């Protein structure tokens, strides 16, 4: 086995998980004051649960309940992608809009990285009933990778991507996992968050639609 391939295999099997544990544990401690501030803001605007749990697809198409800061009203229809709601903005709270735009609603997933259900970098976990995305990911082996807080498809377009493109990017990641690739995605994520790149409430596939026009 060439040194490069051997190194990637070792990273994928051992080092990646070790880094997930170290970084998520540190993040939990450092970000705990921010967690409390966000929790208070959610409670003040729309009394109800601070966290939102939803059934998602994990590695090898197992399921788990992803955890986020609640960004939508308590009476929002469950298990429905935002882009399928007739009027997404109607359901999103004011603090929720800010959390979603800055991706701060995803922070509780640090705890799920620590527990091993997720990784820092990997394909974003699909809803259990996003059958089209799950089927497309099967073509590229992307369902056999631990889902991530951020991923290659996220930084390459996020909500702007159509299902086929999103699955293809997830497949590219699954076939090329390495320390260098993860670092690249991590820093690209920071840039995307600061620019609010790819966030389209109620939309999907906008990038391809623009190209066709």
Name these PLM-found stretches.
Residues 95-102, 171-175:
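Short, well-ordered beta-strand elements within core beta-sheets of diverse protein domains
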Residues 90, 102-105, 178:
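Residue-level signal for the nucleotide or nucleotide-sugar donor/cofactor binding architecture
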Residues 2-75, 112, 179, 184-213:
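A hydrophobic, helix-centered structural microdomain
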Residues 8, 76-94, 98, 124-131:
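Cytosolic-biased juxtamembrane loops and peripheral soluble domains of multi-pass membrane proteins
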Residues 97-119:
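Short, conserved beta-strand/loop elements in beta-sheet-dominated catalytic cores
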Residues 49, 111-213:
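Hydrophobic structural segments characteristic of membrane proteins
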Residues 52-91, 149-169:
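Short, glycine-rich, amphipathic interfacial segments at transmembrane boundaries or analogous
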């Amino acid at each position: 086995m060439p040194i490069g391939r051997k190194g990637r295999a070792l990273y994928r099997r051992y080092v990646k998980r070790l880094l997930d544990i170290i970084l998520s544990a540190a993040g939990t401690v450092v970000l705990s004051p921010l967690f409390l501030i966000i929790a208070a803001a959610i409670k003040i605007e729309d009394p109800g649960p601070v966290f939102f749990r939803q059934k998602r697809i994990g590695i090898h198409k197992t399921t788990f309940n992803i955890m986020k800061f609640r960004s939508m009203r308590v009476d929002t229809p469950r298990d429905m992608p935002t882009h399928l709601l007739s009027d997404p903005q109607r359901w999103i709270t004011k603090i929720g809009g800010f959390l979603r735009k800055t991706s701060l609603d995803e922070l509780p997933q640090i705890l799920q990285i620590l527990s091993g259900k997720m990784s820092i970098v990997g394909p974003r976990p699909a809803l259990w009933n996003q059958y089209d995305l799950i089927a497309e990911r099967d073509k590229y082996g992307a369902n056999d990778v631990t889902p991530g807080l951020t991923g290659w498809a996220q930084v390459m377009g996020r909500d702007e991507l159509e299902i086929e493109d999103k699955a293809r990017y997830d497949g590219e990641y699954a076939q090329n996992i390495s320390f260098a690739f993860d670092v690249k995605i991590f820093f690209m994520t920071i840039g995307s968050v600061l620019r609010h790149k790819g966030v389209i409430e109620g939309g999907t596939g906008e990038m391809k639609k623009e190209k066709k026009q």
